[in-house]
Every structure is written in structure tokens, then in C-alpha cells.
Amino acid sequence: MKKIASFIATAILCASCVFPINMNGIKIGDGKTVKCKGPVTTNTFDLTGFDAITVNGYADMELFQGDQFQVIVKANEDVFQYLDYKVEDGVLVMETKEHVNIKAETYEMTITLPTLKNLTVNGACDADMKTGYSSGENLSVVVNGAGDFELSGIKVPSFNITLNGAGDIEADGLDVENLAVAINGAGDIDLSGKALKASFTVSGAGNIDASGLECENVSTQKSGFASIKLNK
């Protein structure tokens, strides 16, 4: 789960985080914890027609841009009976039945889609998009809880990142017109690439490192123990 455990520990201290969290397992909601065993298997879900993703609970996923939709889950066999994945109004909703908290040695997803407009996490999420993403549509990432994101080669008109809680987001090789980044709580966001206009807001104990970002029009606002580092 990469760095997510340390961020969950920090999130417990953040008033903005309202999720009951158990460090001994993936416990994000108020449902019971189920221990899932069995051989590791891979299943493909027949889900298409979405341009947004909402995670309610926990996810460890890799994201790819492609012409065809694909939702693949690799996990211990017992995990699949608890998954409740569906598409609602163009949004891929990823959650568990009765909001149970899954504890498993293996539980990871691979998602391919043509266009991603919004990624919202209500809980905790490890997410990688390292092979690049280009679109004429705006992109928004919202984390309510804890997150560890590695994003590379994002090329969109407008890119918004909002971190409410704790986490670590790295966005490298950005090529955007407008960039808006906000941290409410504790978190680190590292940015590199270029933007025509950028705004950075941090409330709490967060850090934004934009020293690798080329941008002449930048506005900043911070409070608490926040820090914002710009390219000089």
C-alpha cells in the first residue's frame, strides 16, 4: 500500500477527516471488517460509459488512457463477493457491499478509459497514472481522507487538485493552462512541468512544492504551518 499507512496515521489527527480508520487493516468506513483469503485471481468487470471515478472506501489502482474501457481487479478470491462496482450517471462508483472494510493480502485494480474528468476519493487510495494523459476536457482530483498519487504527463486545459485530509501527490510533466491546488489538512503535493496560470492554497500543515513548475502567473494563500515553494 506504499505510503498510505503513514498518511492514514496523520489523517487521524486531522479534524477535516471524518472516516473511522483502523491501522490494522483497510478500515475506512463504519462497517465491519472482513478478512479475505483464498488464491489470488483476476476478474474483469463489464463496466463502460464512464468519464469519472468515485472511490468510497479503499482502492489501490493503476489508471491508463485507452480507446476501450477496462476494469480489472486482482485480489484474493474472497474479496470479490464483497465488491459493489457500478456505473451511475457516467461515474464508476467503487465501493463494497454494506460498506464492509476489506482486509486482504492482495486487492488491486487496473482501470483503462478514454477520458477522465473527475477522480474523487472518499476514504483512502493509492493511484498511479504514469503513462501520460491528454484530453481537451478539464480534470479534477479530489481526495477526502488519505491518498498517495503518482501522476505523469497530464495535458489538459484545466487541472484541479483538492486534498482534504492527508496524503502525498506527485504530478510530474504537467502541461496545462490553468492549475488550481488546495490542501486542507496535512499533505505534500509536488508539481513539475508548465502552466500558464496557477493558484495554490494551503490550510493546516500542508506543503506544496512547485519549484519544478514553470509558471509566470501564480497566486498563493496559506495559513497554519503551511509552506509553498515556487520556481524562482
Model-inferred region functions:
Residues M1-K232:
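Intrinsically disordered, low-complexity terminal regions
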